[in-house]
C-alpha cells in the first residue's frame, strides 16, 4: 500500500527519485501512464496486470472502454527503478502532467500519483471544502 506525500525534483534527464518506502513494491517493475486531473499514475507491474485483465473482461463493443483503453494503454510506459530509486518519466507524460522540476509524489493506496507541485497545491485548495461532503458520499459508514 502506498501512503504519504513527498516532494522530489525532476532532474534534467526526466528522472524522478521515488520515496524509499515505495521502492520495495516497485522493484519488480512498474507502469507509468496518464491519470485523471492531469497527474500521472504509477502502478506496480502486478497491479497494472490485474487492471489490464479486468478491462479485458468488458466487451470491446463498449465505446467508453475503447476510448479509455486507447488513452490509458497507448500512453503507458514500463520501467524498473535504478539503484537510486529513480524512474524516467517519458517526455510525453511529463508534458501531459505539466512536470517541470518540482513534483509531488503521493501514495494513493494501490498506485502512486505524480503531480506538478503547483497543480497539486491548486487541486488541494479546490477540494478542501468538499472533502467532508465527499466522505459522506463516498465512504458512508466506513469512517
Swiss-Prot record:
Family note: Belongs to the MraZ family.
Classification via InterPro entries: MraZ, MraZ_C, MraZ_dom, MraZ_N, MraZ_sf, SpoVT-AbrB_dom, SpoVT-AbrB_sf
Gene3D superfamilies the record matches: Transcriptional regulator MraZ domain (3.40.1550.20)
One of the record's GO molecular function terms: transcription cis-regulatory region binding
Subunit and interaction comment: Forms oligomers.
Superkingdom of the organism of origin: Bacteria
Subcellular localization(s) per the UniProt record: Cytoplasm, Nucleoid
GO CC field: cytoplasm; nucleoid
CDD domains: MraZ_C (cd16321), MraZ_N (cd16320)
Domain SpoVT-AbrB: 5-47, 76-119
Keywords: Cytoplasm, DNA-binding, Repeat, Transcription, Transcription regulation
NCBIfam families assigned to the protein according to its UniProt record, in alphabetical order: division/cell wall cluster transcriptional repressor MraZ (TIGR00242)
Name recorded for this polypeptide: Transcriptional regulator MraZ
Pfam families xrefs: MraZ
Alphabetical list of HAMAP family matching this protein: MraZ (MF_01008)
Gene: mraZ
Organism per entry: Frankia casuarinae (strain DSM 45818 / CECT 9043 / HFP020203 / CcI3)
Classification of source organism: Bacteria, Bacillati, Actinomycetota, Actinomycetes, Frankiales
GO terms of biological process kind: negative regulation of DNA-templated transcription initiation
